[in-house]
Regions:
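ABC transporter NBD signature
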Residues: 26
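DNA-recognition helix of helix-turn-helix
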Residues: 18, 29, 38, 43-44, ...
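Intrinsically disordered, low-complexity basic tails/linkers immediately adjacent to helix-turn-helix/homeobox/MYB/SANT
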Residues: 78-79
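Acidic, proline/glycine-rich intrinsically disordered inter-domain spacer in sigma factors
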Residues: 1-23
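Short, contiguous strand/loop micro-motifs
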Residues: 5-9, 30, 55
Length: 79
């Protein structure tokens, strides 16, 4: 099989899983996660935007990353 085609399918599959995971999050946690990892905003910018302390934002991101890791492992995705 064509390696690039296989990689493309894996990317699409991973993207679909990520969307499924994001749908499980609260609106606030999803928006914080997207601001950090999709838009590349700093912790400080996110804290200001959501009127939260930086430590609160860091905790939310850590918990969301841990939940994502567990979700992907449950779906059979290896790190």
């Amino acid at each position: 099989p064509d390696v690039s085609r296989e990689q493309q399918l894996q990317s699409q599959e991973l993207g679909a899983l990520l969307n499924d995971f994001l749908a499980t999050l609260s609106d606030e946690n999803r928006r914080i996660f997207m601001r950090r990892y999709w838009y590349g905003e700093s912790i400080g910018e996110i804290a200001q935007r959501f009127r939260l302390g930086e430590s609160n934002v860091k905790t939310k991101l850590m918990r969301t990353r841990n939940a994502l890791r567990a979700f992907l492992e449950k779906e059979g995705v290896k790190p």
